[in-house]
Amino acid sequence: MSNKFKGMIWLRGQVTLANKSILLQVFMPIFLIFLYKFIFSLNGAGKEIGADKLATMLLTISLPFSLAMSVGTPIIIILAEEREKHNLQSLRLAGVTAGQYILSALIWPAIIGIFYIVITPLLVGAKLSNQLFSYSLVLLLTMLVLIFFFLMVGLFCKNQVMAQSLSVPAMLLAAFIPMFSNMSEDLSKVLRYSFMGLFSSYMKDWSHFHLWSGEFLALVVWLLLFAGLSFYLMRHLQILDD
């Protein structure tokens, strides 16, 4: 690992810690999870549908929001800030490649995403003892696709104003697709091939879930598409050279 790459990872960590707005978005999902639990407890949902189904429902609602808010939005804001302040040109002159830049942008979001993948089931009381492998695989793949999706959006933003305008729709899109999939069978058939389709299908019935499916292949296609577009934007905008 080169010193430039280590320095960029360290710098992004410092930017995250120094920006209170980003820190708030990173930790806000924990508050929202407890808020969801409180609201459902007031409605007596646990007694009506059972504790296990309630935990699964909370997991389905909480995880997309947690990943989109704590991982996605900070990516967009940080990239837009770097572009607005012309930090990218300085990195280019320092010899940082597009690959190094994109990879350094993935490290901290991946760490934060893994944190929420681990802690969310514990907070909602979901029992995953027999589903640890499939849960980990589905969520890690989904997280990686989301990171590249928000990275693509962030590279598209020219300034922080544009980032604020696009981050909310992007976050809501990622968060609400699983909810829309559960609203009707027709929507489910369409959205099953979206970049949140594998997650939605898994959360509907993880006990009978099969990884090698159309949803899995669609997710791989989305991953390649978002990653390819991210590198294309780097080249097209002439931010960094390979």
Identify the role of each PLM range:
Residues 20, 140-177:
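A structural motif at transmembrane helix-loop-helix junctions in multipass membrane proteins
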Residues 54-93, 97-121:
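Hydrophobic alpha-helical transmembrane segments of multi-pass membrane transport proteins
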Residues 89, 220-242:
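Junction motif at the cytosolic side of a transmembrane helix
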Residues 98-99, 106-158:
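Alpha-helical transmembrane segments and their short interhelical loops
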Residues 178-224, 228:
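Terminal transmembrane helical anchor/hairpin motif
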